[in-house]
Amino acid sequence: MSARPLRGGLSSAVHALAVALPGGGVERAVLRRYVRPEVVAEEPDIAEREARILRFFEPVDLPTPRLVAVDPAGAETGTPTLLMSLLPGRVDWSPSDMGIWLRRLAEPLPVLHATAVPHAGTLPSFYGYAQNSYDPPSWSLRPEVWSRAVEIFHARHPEESVVCIHRDYHPGNVLWRAGRVSGLVDWPSASIGSPSVDVAHCRANLLGRFDLEVAERFTAIWEELTGNRFNPWADIMIIIGMLDGLRDDPQLNRASVEEALARAVASLGVGRA
């Protein structure tokens, strides 16, 4: 058996396994171990929840991992652990054709959001991630925008139709093969919420890595595919829900993130941005 670490996995250790079979051939899988004590303490059911999510999405027409086994409490492995199928492809942050890449990045979302909402208990309801501090980042040129956004973040959520959402949808969780999406990974945060949340999470990552123009192109494609309008409230929920991590990210396009937040605040009619 061989194992190699996979990139990502902020809340867990993730390895690709290759196991030689007795009759010849190799079985490939992904092992995710929730090894961070603070993660398990906060979410003791995280492995069982992810297993439940993978079972739920298995019949859906999306390239999701297939659950092989789960050790929910770590009784056998020492830590909450999942074994799942290894999907083909690689993450691609450097597309040769941005327009095609954005369209194909958006195409799985209508399928996901059309999935029938399951009975209570299968998926949790969306909520904004709490932060250690809600102060504007030190690099902000418009701290008043962040303060207004924080007020919206803590306010009552708007009434809106809810769907199944990935909750962590962005290019780092999308695999590509021969120029097409071959896998959607990292499902433990899947929830019931506004479809705009998935769009906003992807937008935030596009903002940080590229710029606002790329994020807006992605949003326009999603709106064209679905006939829906993006709710800027979701930008606020996602960006403020990432605030702790945005403070010191050296790769962040700070101007684009702040401009997107300012536009969201202005579009919701909360003062002048």
Q: Language-model features: where?
A:
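Helix-rich C-terminal or lid/interface subdomains of diverse kinases
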Residues: 103, 192, 201-273
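Active-site Asp-x-Gly
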Residues: 162-165, 175-219
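ATP-binding pocket architecture of kinase catalytic cores
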Residues: 4-123
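A general structural signal marking secondary-structure boundaries and capping sites
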Residues: 61, 71, 90, 112-117, ...
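Generic detector of well-ordered alpha-helical packing
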Residues: 51, 86, 167-169, 187, ...
